[in-house]
């Protein structure tokens, strides 16, 4: 009887946790989509200063010269 009670309580906790996380995930996804629709991507043309590839319009940043190529 004790084993059945433990299994039942574990199943209830897992079901509650799964339902709760699904609700939060949908809310986060909607919020993230709203933010992304407001943002515009700004990029640096070739020859401009950069620190990472995603800053360059052509998505290539030279690590040696720290410029977009």
From Swiss-Prot:
Annotated localization: Secreted
Keywords tagged on the record: Disulfide bond, Knottin, Secreted, Signal, Toxin
Top-rank taxon: Eukaryota
Signal peptide: 1-17
UniProt propeptide residues: 18-41
Xref: InterPro entries: Conotoxin
A GO term, aspect molecular function: toxin activity
Disulfide bonds: 43-57, 50-61, 56-68
Notes concerning its domains: The presence of a 'disulfide through disulfide knot' structurally defines this protein as a knottin. The cysteine framework is VI/VII (C-C-CC-C-C).
Family: Belongs to the conotoxin O1 superfamily.
Note in the entry: This precursor corresponds to allele E1b. Has not been merged with other alleles since they may differ due to geographic variation (see strains in PubMed:19606224).
Record's protein name: Conotoxin Eb6.14
Species annotation: Conus ebraeus
Native organism taxonomy: Eukaryota, Metazoa, Spiralia, Lophotrochozoa, Mollusca
